[in-house]
């Protein structure tokens, strides 16, 4: 029997209404002793937490602390002792965690009201009222989904939602090494967002430069891998190709090698004194080393080309089965009409592939926006202009890493993370809703 909180509170008896203040009261009155005691125990734990820590955490959240660490002279020992001050980071974390606990308690209190009202209705209708043992048994039968989802949902809230809110809140503080705000920091409102969007500041210029390159990189990395992957898969699948399993194995072999190992090897090979430049010099083809990582244009092209070697095998895996499922009648009809291979590829193969793999393309584009490994392990964002925090090959995700780990601009790093999330979330949803895979799930014509 499903009931709503508003209905339960409005139509319930006095004990049901009081359950919002004393969770479990209605259950105790209705003879559900164990359930009532459990609700009261949860309330007691909540009250103890709020008295001992929660109220203080909430009270300090608006100011984020003000007492700095101090040196105090100990006359007895004849030395200076350090007295710990406030830690704004912990105050922020504990304050947000307290808000989560309060919300969780409100949900429990609302559940107690609904439970009491449900018990009231069952009594009025003369229906069977479950004992505690029967309620527990129902968790393995009709309410199995509730038991199975409890742990995963709790994990998402604690390890995903809570850190996400914590990170977002940092964007509204001055938490950075600037003016020594790494221990004590304050709320600054939208100042960090203004700094990021100000094209006249060094940070603002870096943001728009990195953002533009990130989009260019994601487009090339996604569609070049996709198109070349389809072409290679077509070559392997065509009737005249021998040893198809062998060729697939060769391409898939690169996936088996840990990516960070292969990228570091490629970085070493393409270095100024790497094997590629040495071989080309010895062959007399060049007189000075090619600037694979020291010239911005060369570095960007290098990253895109190396990504082809990494990404094409994944595309081959993805599209091989789909290519084999394209109806042969379409190709036979095209042969009757006198279409050549190129026309069949443009008019049949690509439209069918785009119809089926549009969601895959969107997720791949999103993954490339956040592709940390290839850029950081291959170029580390280089080359970097003097005084700049971002390099010419930095993506938003690698720049965010540098801003937080290398430069300790945690507030600006949080802003970059928020902007990346907003762009990806809105962009992905809008594009997905416009695809034929979403609009027409029935089939391909």
Residue locations for each model-derived region?
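Membrane-interfacial interhelical loops
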Residues: 57-95
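A structural signal for multi-pass alpha-helical bundles of membrane permease subunits
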Residues: 53-63, 113, 144-445
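N-terminal signal-anchor/first transmembrane alpha helix
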Residues: 2-16, 21-29, 33-50, 80-172, ...
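Short membrane-interface loop/juxtamembrane segments of multi-pass integral membrane proteins
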Residues: 76-84, 130-139, 196-203, 288-293
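Transmembrane-helix bundle segments that line or gate the permeation/cavity pathway
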Residues: 31, 42, 53-69, 100
């Amino acid at each position: 029997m499903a009931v709503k909180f508003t209905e339960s509170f409005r139509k319930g008896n006095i004990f049901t209404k009081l359950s919002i203040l004393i969770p479990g009261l209605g259950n105790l009155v209705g003879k559900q002793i164990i359930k009532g005691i459990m609700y009261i125990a949860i309330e007691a734990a909540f009250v103890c937490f709020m008295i001992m820590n929660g109220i203080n955490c909430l009270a300090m959240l608006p100011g984020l602390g003000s007492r700095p660490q101090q040196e105090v002279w100990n006359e007895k020992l004849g030395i200076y002792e350090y007295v710990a001050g406030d830690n704004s980071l912990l105050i922020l974390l504990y304050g947000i965690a307290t808000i989560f606990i309060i919300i969780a308690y409100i949900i429990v209190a609302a559940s107690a009201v609904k439970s009491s009202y449900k018990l009231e209705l069952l009594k009025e209708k003369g229906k069977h009222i479950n004992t505690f043992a029967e309620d527990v048994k129902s968790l393995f039968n009709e309410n199995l989904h509730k038991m199975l989802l409890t742990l995963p949902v709790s994990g998402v809230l604690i390890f995903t939602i809570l850190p996400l809110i914590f990170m977002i809140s940092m964007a509204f503080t001055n938490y950075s090494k600037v003016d020594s705000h790494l221990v004590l920091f304050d709320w600054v409102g939208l100042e960090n967002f203004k700094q990021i969007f100000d094209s006249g500041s060094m940070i603002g210029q870096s943001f728009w430069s990195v953002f533009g390159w990130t989009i260019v990189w994601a487009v090339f990395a996604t569609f070049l891998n996709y198109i070349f992957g389809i072409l290679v898969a077509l070559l392997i699948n065509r009737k005249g190709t021998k040893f198809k399993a062998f060729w697939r194995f060769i391409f898939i072999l690169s996936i088996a090698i840990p990516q960070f190992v292969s990228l570091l090897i490629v970085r070493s090979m393409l270095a100024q004194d790497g094997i590629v430049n040495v071989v080309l010099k010895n062959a007399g083809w060049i007189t000075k080393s090619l600037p694979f990582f020291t010239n911005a244009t060369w570095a960007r092209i290098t990253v895109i080309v190396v990504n082809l070697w990494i990404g094409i095998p994944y595309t081959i895996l993805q599209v091989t089965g789909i290519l084999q499922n394209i109806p042969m009648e379409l190709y036979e009809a095209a042969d009757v009409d006198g279409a050549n291979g190129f026309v069949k590829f443009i008019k049949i193969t690509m439209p069918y592939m785009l119809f089926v793999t549009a969601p895959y393309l969107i997720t791949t584009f999103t993954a490339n926006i956040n592709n940390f490994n290839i850029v950081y392990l291959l170029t580390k964002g280089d080359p970097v202009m003097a005084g700049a925090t971002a390099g010419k090959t930095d993506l938003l995700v690698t720049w965010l890493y540098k801003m937080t780990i290398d430069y300790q601009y945690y507030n600006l790093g949080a802003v970059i993370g928020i902007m990346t999330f907003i762009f990806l979330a809105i962009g992905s949803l809008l594009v997905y809703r416009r695809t034929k895979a979403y609009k027409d799930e029935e089939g391909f014509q």
